[in-house]
């Protein structure tokens, strides 16, 4: 079992930006559900919210083979946006679901990247990576075989 992350090479991100984007991609399968409030409860003391408790449910294989194992990750490079989106297409053809099995990571363009697209509020962003939840090795290989290691 391994986690696959594919990052764009054409953006020429600095090492720090690349690391940050890959970290976002690595954690998205955990942070996106929490950020949407799934399994989150407030912790109260004396009527005041002092924190939050988040429940994360992992399938048996993910826990036993990845969390309780080696946290194996493979980082590949995509030549450009179109090649990165090919990974999305391959994943969907394999039955994987966006925002559950894989996550498209977009930078908010506050530092070194220029926006490629804009959301409904006019906020600029650039697609940088695709991150997958931990996958069986054979599925990760089917997606990554079209890409080189970063």
Where are the model-predicted features located?
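Positively charged, small/polar-rich N-terminal and surface patches that mediate targeting and assembly
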Residues: 1-150
């Amino acid at each position: 079992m391994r986690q696959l992350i594919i990052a764009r090479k054409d953006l020429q991100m600095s090492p720090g930006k690349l690391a940050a984007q890959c970290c976002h991609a690595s954690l998205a399968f955990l942070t996106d559900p929490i950020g949407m409030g799934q399994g989150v409860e407030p912790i109260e003391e004396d009527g005041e919210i002092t924190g939050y408790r988040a429940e994360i449910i992992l399938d048996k294989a993910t826990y036993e083979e990845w969390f309780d194992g080696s946290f194996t990750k493979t980082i590949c490079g995509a030549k450009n946006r179109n090649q990165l989106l090919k990974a999305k297409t391959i994943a969907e053809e394999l039955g994987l679901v966006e925002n559950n099995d894989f996550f498209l990571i977009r930078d908010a363009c506050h530092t070194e990247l220029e926006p490629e697209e804009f959301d409904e509020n006019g906020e600029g962003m650039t697609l940088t990576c695709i991150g997958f939840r931990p996958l069986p090795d054979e599925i990760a290989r089917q997606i990554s075989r079209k890409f080189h290691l970063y």
